[in-house]
């Protein structure tokens, strides 16, 4: 083995919960410019906690904005392929910011408080880029960046409702998937959304720093296990949720990334629309697929996929997951190899393993 | 988790340990390495009878987080391979100094080759600073 360099931690940003993480024995690693907890106990234990009961994540590194003004809806409609005009107050939409070439600038969630008032949550590593893009393309919109003043916690798992219910003043059973509300949480205001990145039921909770720290402390003291980025990655991959910068970036369009479901084909003009229409008509040359891999070795980011001697694709994310207990991966493959059931070989550091294109997600929770 | 470094072993800065038994040496990875790797899911090792050379890769150890090469701390012939650990790599994580050993090697030259090892105390200072 070789000693691995973890980079210069001193240049990294820390969330307001960093002291809590250290106190809980977290191993901290650099992630997208932030020093973040990788795990507190073990990745497998944290993963299973979220699948079977509940787990708590600090995701305060994510970008958090509010957009307000009379003309907000018309302006944000130009930036995304989803029809945000369909949203009622209290509803949210996962979508992508597109550039003029239909390349994905980021994936993000727009939460509609009202047509004049939106909450937007974006990836931590792309926060600066997104903020610049929005500033450049939104006129007359009041933009408020909450990233530095607010925490964001994710409480995820089948026991999330019963865990959180005693702390809030609304009936959580009445808050549907992807719905959100302004609530009183332990007597303080909080933004509560039934969203997440694990494939489980759960909530994302945004509040001012002191309230976020208090919530973290009260939940962990009550026995909710804190979970790190390691479990977050295996959970999201089982649910076939994409990681920006790894499974998609500005060189991929939503159709190539198998995110066609976020596109409303009838909505008015937006960046990249002509290119998406052309791709829809002609099909894309490559697309993101799910793979299962034979054996126990993990097909990791960057590993090549082969049909005989011809390289026909590349792995973007891979892991061996606690729930499915076999190697799974996301990969871009050429059109002929995208259908379910296609057989390919993945080059794992010089050795070939058979891989099969399978239906995504790899894991789906029982409803 | 409190990490242990048994006194009777010799340690490499690449996080392998050596248990010297006459002219044979048992090679494994330290509890520090195991702790850094996290859940171990796969290990590839040489075959019995293979010749390994000091400094060369003799296999790899893989966790969900990362893959690390295993480097031979000495030159010799592989006498036996821990096939139980190959079948159940979690054993390396749960018992690195016992049932989770990796290979047993007969030294090519018993008089040589073990010069650059550390004692348990030196290794502890190195990894825990």
Swiss-Prot record, chain B:
The glycine cleavage system catalyzes the degradation of glycine. The H protein shuttles the methylamine group of glycine from the P protein to the T protein. The modification N6-lipoyllysine is found at residue 65. GO terms for cellular component: cytosol; glycine cleavage complex. The keyword rRNA-binding does not apply. One of its GO terms (biological process) is glycine decarboxylation via glycine cleavage system. The glycine cleavage system is composed of four proteins: P, T, L and H. The gene is gcvH. Pfam families: GCV_H. Residues 24-106 form the Lipoyl-binding domain. PROSITE patterns: BIOTINYL_LIPOYL, LIPOYL. This is Glycine cleavage system H protein. Belongs to the GcvH family. It comes from Gloeobacter violaceus (strain ATCC 29082 / PCC 7421). Binds 1 lipoyl cofactor covalently.
């Amino acid at each position: 083995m070789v000693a691995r360099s973890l980079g210069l931690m001193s240049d990294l940003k820390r969330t307001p919960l960093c002291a809590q993480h250290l106190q809980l024995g977290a191993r901290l690693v650099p992630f997208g410019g932030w020093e973040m907890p990788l795990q507190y106990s073990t990745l497998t234990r944290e993963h299973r906690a979220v699948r079977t009961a509940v787990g708590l994540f600090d995701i305060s590194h994510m970008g958090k904005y509010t957009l307000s003004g009379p003309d907000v809806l018309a302006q944000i409609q130009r930036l995304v392929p989803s029809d945000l005009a369909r949203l009622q107050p209290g509803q949210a939409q996962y979508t992508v910011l597109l550039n003029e070439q239909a390349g994905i600038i980021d994936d993000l969630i727009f939460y509609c408080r009202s047509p004049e008032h939106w909450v937007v949550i974006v990836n931590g590593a792309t926060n600066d880029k997104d903020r610049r893009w929005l500033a450049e393309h939104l006129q007359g919109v009041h933009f408020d960046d909450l990233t530095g003043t607010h925490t964001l916690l994710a409480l995820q798992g089948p026991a999330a409702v019963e865990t959180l219910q005693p702390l809030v003043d609304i009936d959580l059973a009445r808050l549907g998937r992807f719905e959100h509300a302004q609530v009183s949480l332990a007597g303080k205001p909080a933004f509560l959304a039934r969203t997440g990145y694990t494939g489980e039921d759960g909530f994302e909770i945004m509040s001012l720093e002191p309230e976020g720290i208090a919530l973290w402390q009260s939940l962990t003291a009550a026995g909710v296990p804190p979970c790190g980025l390691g479990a977050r990655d295996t959970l999201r991959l089982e649910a076939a949720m994409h990681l920006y910068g790894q499974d998609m970036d500005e060189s991929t369009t939503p159709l190539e990334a198998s995110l066609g479901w976020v596109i409303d084909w009838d909505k008015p003009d937006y960046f990249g629309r002509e290119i998406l229409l052309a791709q829809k008509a002609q099909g894309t040359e490559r697309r993101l697929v799910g793979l299962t891999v034979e054996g126990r070795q993990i097909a990791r980011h960057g590993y090549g996929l082969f049909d005989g001697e011809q390289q026909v694709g590349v792995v973007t994310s891979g892991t061996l997951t606690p729930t499915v207990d076999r190697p799974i991966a996301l990969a871009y493959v050429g059109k002929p190899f995208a259908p379910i059931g296609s057989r390919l070989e993945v080059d794992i550091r010089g050795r070939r393993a058979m891989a099969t294109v399978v239906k995504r997600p790899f894991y789906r929770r029982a409803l | 988790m409190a990490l242990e470094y048994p006194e009777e072993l010799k340690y490499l800065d690449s996080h392998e340990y050596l248990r010297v038994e006459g002219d044979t040496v048992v090679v494994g990875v330290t509890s520090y390495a195991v702790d850094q790797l996290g859940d171990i899911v796969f290990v590839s090792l040489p075959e019995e009878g293979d010749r390994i050379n000091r400094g060369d890769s003799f296999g790899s150890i893989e966790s969900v987080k990362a893959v690390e090469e295993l480097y031979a701390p000495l030159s010799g012939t592989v006498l036996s391979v821990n096939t139980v650990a190959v079948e159940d790599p979690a054993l390396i994580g749960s018992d690195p100094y016992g049932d989770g050993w990796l290979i047993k090697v007969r030294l090519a030259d018993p008089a040589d080759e073990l010069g650059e090892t550390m004692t348990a105390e030196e290794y502890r200072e190195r990894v825990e600073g």
